[in-house]
Amino acid sequence: MASLMLNGAITFPKGLGSPGSNLHARSIPRPTLLSVTRTSTPRLSVATRCSSSSVSSSRPSAQPRFIQHKKEAYWFYRFLSIVYDHVINPGHWTEDMRDDALEPADLSHPDMRVVDVGGGTGFTTLGIVKTVKAKNVTILDQSPHQLAKAKQKEPLKECKIVEGDAEDLPFPTDYADRYVSAGSIEYWPDPQRGIREAYRVLKIGGKACLIGPVYPTFWLSRFFSDVWMLFPKEEEYIEWFKNAGFKDVQLKRIGPKWYRGVRRHGLIMGCSVTGVKPASGDSPLQLGPKEEDVEKPVNNPFSFLGRFLLGTLAAAWFVLIPIYMWIKDQIVPKDQPI
């Protein structure tokens, strides 16, 4: 969730933001496929709360980032899990934001089978089990430390807990009614592959709901996001969903209510993207081998340490932003933009 707090650029009726969690880990081998080239540019489809134009900034398509290996993300969350629910979520992923972001997922029936990919400490899962029976929900994450926190939450006692890789899900094809992933895409080396997997595991007519950050416009936030992890553009989310085969793709902007007017400063923007699986079976999109072997160790421990420290500095920036904006919200009259 921490990663949501740094983007946006115009004023919307509701705020925006994003969750923070992780996923990946032990992968289950799947057949290697060949890559294909797509030449058409998908049209941006946006929900009614969102203007049709994107306010995200441009960035290099292959921009390197701080956490480039899932093992590094594993260690990052080894320590973040200690304070995640009490320090990160209050400023970046509130209960109101969570419920607002999950609304497009249509979690309308208690007997739905739901997978929460990158579920982490289970904060997003707590929103899911408000309407879906816990025994029908599976929480998947690469971090055993995050999952240990989820196991301690009473409403989640009946949920299935799985260590796994978002880009190689340990579920059969046509398995779930709903796929939810909040604050995980930031750590995916290949987001298109992860969304393709979302398509595969859903039943026909099933819906995927992916919640994540959007690339910022504020220059300092752009700098930290470029060196830290993945912050997609709104149109990239739409394209990835459509490439995977999803129909009725919608995007909804989300954020904390007390971020009044700050989008004009380019500080924050997050989104909830949904798509419906139109046919049973695997995704029509074919991809080559995975870019990253999660079983491989980190190549250079000194390089890893340097990137880890730099990423910690970037994370500190994202923690300070909501504190600053909360103070301004208390000072500035409610009828004036911040």
From Swiss-Prot:
<dbReference type="GO" id="GO:0010236">
    <property type="term" value="P:plastoquinone biosynthetic process"/>
</dbReference>
<feature type="transit peptide" description="Chloroplast">
    <location>
        <begin position="1"/>
        <end position="51"/>
    </location>
</feature>
<feature type="region of interest" description="SAM motif III">
    <location>
        <begin position="200"/>
        <end position="213"/>
    </location>
</feature>
<dbReference type="InterPro" id="IPR013216">
    <property type="entry name" value="Methyltransf_11"/>
</dbReference>
<dbReference type="InterPro" id="IPR029063">
    <property type="entry name" value="SAM-dependent_MTases_sf"/>
</dbReference>
<keyword id="KW-1001">Plastid inner membrane</keyword>
<keyword id="KW-0934">Plastid</keyword>
<dbReference type="GO" id="GO:0051742">
    <property type="term" value="F:2-methyl-6-solanyl-1,4-benzoquinone methyltransferase activity"/>
</dbReference>
<dbReference type="GO" id="GO:0009706">
    <property type="term" value="C:chloroplast inner membrane"/>
</dbReference>
<keyword id="KW-0812">Transmembrane</keyword>
<feature type="topological domain" description="Chloroplast intermembrane">
    <location>
        <begin position="52"/>
        <end position="307"/>
    </location>
</feature>
<dbReference type="GO" id="GO:0009507">
    <property type="term" value="C:chloroplast"/>
</dbReference>
<feature type="region of interest" description="SAM motif I">
    <location>
        <begin position="114"/>
        <end position="123"/>
    </location>
</feature>
<dbReference type="GO" id="GO:0051741">
    <property type="term" value="F:2-methyl-6-phytyl-1,4-benzoquinone methyltransferase activity"/>
</dbReference>
<dbReference type="GO" id="GO:0005829">
    <property type="term" value="C:cytosol"/>
</dbReference>
<dbReference type="InterPro" id="IPR031164">
    <property type="entry name" value="SAM_MPBQ_MSBQ_MT"/>
</dbReference>
<dbReference type="GO" id="GO:0009536">
    <property type="term" value="C:plastid"/>
</dbReference>
<keyword id="KW-0472">Membrane</keyword>
<comment type="function">
    <text>Involved in a key methylation step in both tocopherols (vitamin E) and plastoquinone synthesis. Catalyzes the conversion of 2-methyl-6-phytyl-1,4-hydroquinone (MPBQ) to 2,3-dimethyl-6-phytyl-1,4-hydroquinone (DMPQ, a substrate for tocopherol cyclase), and 2-methyl-6-solanyl-1,4-benzoquinone (MSBQ) to plastoquinone.</text>
</comment>
<keyword id="KW-0150">Chloroplast</keyword>
<dbReference type="InterPro" id="IPR044649">
    <property type="entry name" value="MPBQ/MSBQ_MT"/>
</dbReference>
<dbReference type="GO" id="GO:0102550">
    <property type="term" value="F:2-methyl-6-geranylgeranyl-1,4-benzoquinol methyltransferase activity"/>
</dbReference>
<dbReference type="GO" id="GO:0008757">
    <property type="term" value="F:S-adenosylmethionine-dependent methyltransferase activity"/>
</dbReference>
<feature type="transmembrane region" description="Helical">
    <location>
        <begin position="308"/>
        <end position="328"/>
    </location>
</feature>
<feature type="region of interest" description="SAM motif II">
    <location>
        <begin position="159"/>
        <end position="172"/>
    </location>
</feature>
<keyword id="KW-1133">Transmembrane helix</keyword>
<comment type="pathway">
    <text>Cofactor biosynthesis; tocopherol biosynthesis.</text>
</comment>
<keyword id="KW-0808">Transferase</keyword>
<keyword id="KW-0489">Methyltransferase</keyword>
<keyword id="KW-0809">Transit peptide</keyword>
<keyword id="KW-0949">S-adenosyl-L-methionine</keyword>
<feature type="topological domain" description="Stromal">
    <location>
        <begin position="329"/>
        <end position="338"/>
    </location>
</feature>
<dbReference type="Pfam" id="PF08241">
    <property type="entry name" value="Methyltransf_11"/>
</dbReference>
<comment type="similarity">
    <text>Belongs to the class I-like SAM-binding methyltransferase superfamily. MPBQ/MBSQ MT family.</text>
</comment>
<dbReference type="GO" id="GO:0032259">
    <property type="term" value="P:methylation"/>
</dbReference>
<dbReference type="GO" id="GO:0010189">
    <property type="term" value="P:vitamin E biosynthetic process"/>
</dbReference>
<dbReference type="GO" id="GO:0009941">
    <property type="term" value="C:chloroplast envelope"/>
</dbReference>
<protein>
    <recommendedName>
        <fullName>2-methyl-6-phytyl-1,4-hydroquinone methyltransferase, chloroplastic</fullName>
        <ecNumber>2.1.1.295</ecNumber>
    </recommendedName>
</protein>
